[in-house]
Amino acid sequence: MQDQKGKIISVIGPVVDVKFPEGQLPNVYDALKVKNEYSGEELILEVEQLIGDDTARCVAMDSTDGIRRGQEVINTLEPIKVPVGDTTLGRMVNLLGKPIDEKGDVEGEEYWPIHRDPPSLNEQDTSIEILETGIKCIDLLAPFPRGGKIGFFGGAGVGKTVLVMELIRNIAKEHQGISVFAGVGERTREGNDLWLEMQETGVIDSTALVFGQMNEPPGARFRVPLTALTISEYFRDRQKKDVLLFIDNIFRFVQAGSEVSALLGRMPSAVGYQPTLASDMGQLQERITSTKDGSITSVQAIYVPADDFTDPAPATTFAHLDANINLSRRQSELGLYPAVDPLDSTSKMLDPNVVGQDHYSVAREVKEVLQRYEDLQDIIAILGIEELSEEDRQIVNRARRIQRFLTQPFFVAERFTNYSGKYVNVEDTIKGFKEILEGKHDDLPESAFYMVGTIEEAVEKAKKMNE
């Protein structure tokens, strides 16, 4: 078939208008190719809008430096396609599936388009199942649904990346699962650190990484999550595996969409975001789901601009999440890692019909004790703990033990902490907290509960301390 060719008629930043002969207009989301005479590379444009009878308005997936009016553009007659399959594991690619790890081309078992329909309702799995992470504070207070969506909120330096890496390690080692990491609009240095740390900790072999960092044009940042999701869908649908999809940071995905929105001629909506914000987010999130064959469970880091949770970007994301994990600076300053805020983190799965009455009751009681401790902080600071009633003093003592027992040594942080990593089953987690709440370990020193796995380890640690 003869190539369908057009000519560039305007270039405004990342947005390029291409004129085609009559009857040869491409479809929306078709990929167009143009030779960048400046770099000698081939530039991919994605059709976003059709204007009039003969013009396609496109977004460039790389820098448009060196592109000029009158240049010839070839229509590939299909959307952007990326390599999928086992060959992507242990590799780092960009949104087009091109390697950025200097290890040679990625030859896919198949090539799938990045724009795909979500599974039909008939294919989706409606059963509710908990994904055990082996991390006590998450499994107890904000359990993850298999095939659900989890949001991590936290500022810089509170341990988001370490928590992400521990989850990748636990899924790979304990569940024989596969992880896909999408780096969207974050710092290149952080991406490099993650890549090097993954190689050192040995989780790289069961992970595919897709990056479009801060230095990339908005078109690339806007499509990186779709590439990572397409790679995940292959493992779910063809290999029938459970996949963990990490997106860091989902806010940058929205930000990239708003950057090109005005150039595409759309009227901005609230706070200058794109008018298609909800549908852009929906198209991505609806594809993250469980089918009868496998599941995609997604963990999304979410930057909250100016700590304003009513901002349209985080507010739109909230609607899709099943669990919110809040990483608190106060916890990390106290040395309580993982720095998950037990009172601010929630999950729709913490329901007696899902996790069972025992788990639910222990989790509620843990939160009640910690909340009471929080309420008593002012009195303790002003008058001292001696002024509290006997009952309140007991609550404070148990709350401090619970706080420390919520900490846990991570496998991926072994070389920094000198504590050997621990994976704790949900049953052991519930048993441990239940015994603390019942007062069985009121006689043990607080420090015995810090950085241990099960309650038996805390008892053992206390014995060693007394020797």
UniProtKB/Swiss-Prot annotation:
Enzyme class, first EC level, given as a word: translocase
MF term (GO), any: ATP binding
Protein origin, superkingdom: Bacteria
Annotated InterPro entries: AAA+_ATPase, ATP-synt_VA_C, ATP_synth_F1_bsu, ATPase_a/bsu_AS, ATPase_alpha/beta_chains, ATPase_F1/V1/A1_a/bsu_N, ATPase_F1/V1/A1_a/bsu_N_sf, ATPase_F1/V1/A1_a/bsu_nucl-bd
Subcellular location: Cell inner membrane
Reactions catalysed, as given in the entry: ATP + H2O + 4 H(+)(in) = ADP + phosphate + 5 H(+)(out)
Keywords: ATP synthesis, ATP-binding, Cell inner membrane, Cell membrane, CF(1), Hydrogen ion transport, Ion transport, Membrane, Nucleotide-binding, Translocase, Transport
EC number of the protein: 7.1.2.2
Binding-site positions, ATP: 154-161
NCBIfam families associated with the record: atpD
HAMAP family: ATP_synth_beta_bact
Subunit structure: F-type ATPases have 2 components, CF(1) - the catalytic core - and CF(0) - the membrane proton channel. CF(1) has five subunits: alpha(3), beta(3), gamma(1), delta(1), epsilon(1). CF(0) has three main subunits: a(1), b(2) and c(9-12). The alpha and beta chains form an alternating ring which encloses part of the gamma chain. CF(1) is attached to CF(0) by a central stalk formed by the gamma and epsilon chains, while a peripheral stalk is formed by the delta and b chains.
Family to which the UniProt record says this protein belongs: Belongs to the ATPase alpha/beta chains family.
Function (record text): Produces ATP from ADP in the presence of a proton gradient across the membrane. The catalytic sites are hosted primarily by the beta subunits.
Name listed for the protein in its UniProt record: ATP synthase subunit beta
Organism (species): Petrotoga mobilis (strain DSM 10674 / SJ95)
Higher taxonomy: Bacteria, Thermotogati, Thermotogota, Thermotogae, Petrotogales
Gene name of the encoded protein: atpD
